[in-house]
């Protein structure tokens, strides 16, 4: 272990769509958590790794906490709360453009039993007038004994370096858990599937997003500069399959083009992406289907 090397695990907690994934991608400098304006975008805890010369922070981006309406929803909330027993610090992220609501209070109640340092992170300050920020800080200030309060813009990067510096100073001396050039502990197959699912969320209508899972069936390196990726998009109804395929296959082609570009950035090679769409009724409420589609809580 290096002398005076600080390391540890930090959970990012918050209501859906407060910008947790945007912050994580900002910190590690590459897209590993998918972003969308649709709720429940992040379904598994994704570990992003930030490393500098004398410190390493392993971030866990949890699914947004919400009132569950299906077994998948139960999994997502349990997944978010289970991280609180595993970490050295917690970032409680709130949206500066929204009033404090029941979802925030739900999280605050669960954080009252956490003995680790809790940071209040007020995100999206680039979207509000500075005068409003003081009101937001006052609204949250007495809800918990926060280690620090950081107003940030994950999108623009405002105050993100200062937040990282504070976390480094908070973490104990410890080992470097991962190599310096590693930014996540998830395999390429998992991230490729998430990038494809992001494009489905971006491009399809409201009916589809919560009913979509992606299984990457195969990643095969055909030569030194070419990678074949084969994946199946799983939906619950035939009508959703029709939306994703689109007229003459146009929508599926758009999804493929956009996803391929991001996968190429991740892999650093030319990618041939083949996509299929499969109907699997009620997969969100069947435990066996959840596990087959990658929702195994112990894995993350």
From Swiss-Prot:
Keywords: Cell membrane, Cytoplasm, GTP-binding, Membrane, Nucleotide-binding, Ribosome biogenesis, RNA-binding, rRNA-binding. SUPFAM superfamilies: P-loop containing nucleoside triphosphate hydrolases, Prokaryotic type KH domain (KH-domain type II). One of its GO terms (biological process) is ribosomal small subunit assembly. Its main location: cytoplasm. Residues 61-64 are annotated as: G3. Residues 152-154 are annotated as: G5. InterPro entries: G_ERA_dom, GTP-bd, GTPase_Era-like, KH_dom-like_a/b, KH_dom_type_2, KH_sf_prok-type, P-loop_NTPase, Small_GTP-bd. Residues 6-173 form the Era-type G domain. It is found in: Cytoplasm; Cell membrane. Residues 204-281 form the KH type-2 domain. GTP binds at residues 14-21, 61-65, 123-126. CDD domains: Era (cd04163), KH-II_Era (cd22534). Residues 40-44 are annotated as: G2. Residues 123-126 are annotated as: G4. One of its GO terms (molecular function) is GTPase activity. Residues 14-21 are annotated as: G1. Monomer. HAMAP family: GTPase_Era. Belongs to the TRAFAC class TrmE-Era-EngA-EngB-Septin-like GTPase superfamily. Era GTPase family. This is GTPase Era. It comes from Ligilactobacillus salivarius (strain UCC118). The lineage of its organism: Bacteria, Bacillati, Bacillota, Bacilli, Lactobacillales.
């Amino acid at each position: 272990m290096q002398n005076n090397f600080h390391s540890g695990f930090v959970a990012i907690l918050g209501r859906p769509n407060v910008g947790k994934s945007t912050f994580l991608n900002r910190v590690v400098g590459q897209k590993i958590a998918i972003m969308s304006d649709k709720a429940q975008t992040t379904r598994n805890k994704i570990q992003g790794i930030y490393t500098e010369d004398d410190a390493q922070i392993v971030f866990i981006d949890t699914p947004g906490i919400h009132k569950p309406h299906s077994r998948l929803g139960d999994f997502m909330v349990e997944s978010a709360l289970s991280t609180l027993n595993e970490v050295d610090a917690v970032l409680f992220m709130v949206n500066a453009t929204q009033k404090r609501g029941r979802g925030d209070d739900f999280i605050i109640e669960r954080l009252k039993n956490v003995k680790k340092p809790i940071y209040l992170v007020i995100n999206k300050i680039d979207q509000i007038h500075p005068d409003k920020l003081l009101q937001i800080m006052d609204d949250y200030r007495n809800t918990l004994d926060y280690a620090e309060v950081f107003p940030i813009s994950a999108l623009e990067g405002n105050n993100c370096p200062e937040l990282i510096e504070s976390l480094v100073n908070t973490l104990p001396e410890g080992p470097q858990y991962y190599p310096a050039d590693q930014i996540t502990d998830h395999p390429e197959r998992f991230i490729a599937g998430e990038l494809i699912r992001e494009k489905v969320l971006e491009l399809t209508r409201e009916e589809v997003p919560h009913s979509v899972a992606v299984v990457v069936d195969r990643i095969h390196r055909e030569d030194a500069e070419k990678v074949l990726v084969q994946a199946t998009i799983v939906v619950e109804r035939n009508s959703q399959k029709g939306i994703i395929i689109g007229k003459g296959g146009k929508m599926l082609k758009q999804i493929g083009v956009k996803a391929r570009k991001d996968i190429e950035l991740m892999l650093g090679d030319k990618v041939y992406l083949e996509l299929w769409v499969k109907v699997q009724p009620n997969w969100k409420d069947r435990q066996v289907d959840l596990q087959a589609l990658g929702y195994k809580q112990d894995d993350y």
